[in-house]
């Protein structure tokens, strides 16, 4: 049996743009994607802490060190510039893969600059 757990998240980032005319997705600073281990076009769940919206889209890279977090297409209607977002990916794991597993959490400042990458070793999954 496989279980679905949090794989990684970019925590409390700031929405910097909304482009309703783009085909879809969320643009994320390439450095943040890399540090979180999120691949281009990977499915992500986005939670808008300002309005409670939760939605699924896919990630595309924005220029490295740009601080860009931009909602595109229809998702652009689900936030306004300055809203704080949590961007998450999930993975499927077997019991064997879960031994000593913990998610990756990317912490950023208000301009979406990388502050730290955390591994919650004190919250290891016990199987």
Curated annotation (Swiss-Prot):
The active site is at residues 25, 58. Pfam families: Asp_decarbox (PF02261). Is synthesized initially as an inactive proenzyme, which is activated by self-cleavage at a specific serine bond to produce a beta-subunit with a hydroxyl group at its C-terminus and an alpha-subunit with a pyruvoyl group at its N-terminus. It is found in: Cytoplasm. Its EC number is 4.1.1.11. It is an enzyme of class 4 (lyase). Substrate binds at residues 57, 73-75. GO terms for molecular function: aspartate 1-decarboxylase activity. Keywords: Autocatalytic cleavage, Cytoplasm, Decarboxylase, Lyase, Pantothenate biosynthesis, Pyruvate, Schiff base, Zymogen. The modification Pyruvic acid (Ser) is found at residue 25. GO terms for biological process: alanine biosynthetic process; pantothenate biosynthetic process. Its cofactor is pyruvate. It catalyses: L-aspartate + H(+) = beta-alanine + CO2. Binds 1 pyruvoyl group covalently per subunit. CDD domains: Asp_decarbox (cd06919). Pathway: Cofactor biosynthesis; (R)-pantothenate biosynthesis; beta-alanine from L-aspartate: step 1/1. NCBIfam families: panD. Belongs to the PanD family. HAMAP family: PanD. Catalyzes the pyruvoyl-dependent decarboxylation of aspartate to produce beta-alanine. Heterooctamer of four alpha and four beta subunits. This is Aspartate 1-decarboxylase.
């Amino acid at each position: 049996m496989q279980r679905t757990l949090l794989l990684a998240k970019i925590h409390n980032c700031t929405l910097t743009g909304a482009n309703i005319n783009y085909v879809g997705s969320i643009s994320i600073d390439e450095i943040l994607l890399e540090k979180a281990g999120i691949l281009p076009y990977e499915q992500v769940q986005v939670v808008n802490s300002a309005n409670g919206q939760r939605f699924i889209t896919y990630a595309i890279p924005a220029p490295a060190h740009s601080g860009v977090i931009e909602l595109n297409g229809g998702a652009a209607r689900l936030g306004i510039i300055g809203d704080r977002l949590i961007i998450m990916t999930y993975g499927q794991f077997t019991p064997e893969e879960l031994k000593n597993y913990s998610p990756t959490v990317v912490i950023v400042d208000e301009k979406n600059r990388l502050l730290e990458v955390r591994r919650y070793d004190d919250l290891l999954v016990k199987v």
